[in-house]
Amino acid sequence: MTLFNSISSISNSTGLSKQSLIVNVDGNTSSSGGNSTSWLGGFDGCGGCGGFGSYGGCRGFGGCGGSNLNIINVDIDIGRRRRRCC
């Protein structure tokens, strides 16, 4: 069993109006905090389209059917990776 909570995301540079969070009853929790966020493309568990910063466009993923939910983990900390310059 899974509880779905929809919250309004902060639309400063993301371009998203709403963000879906997933809380699994079996102990797995996906939340938005820190530098990364977890969200589901569609409520049917079959994915969908979502533009998140530089992740624009539709990104479909399999695994539809049953009680399997596919969660997309988006890392907002892109660009702050360890880079060594000259």
From Swiss-Prot:
It comes from the Eukaryota. The lineage of its organism: Eukaryota, Amoebozoa, Evosea, Eumycetozoa, Dictyostelia. Belongs to the UPF0512 family. It comes from Dictyostelium discoideum (Social amoeba). This is UPF0512 protein V.
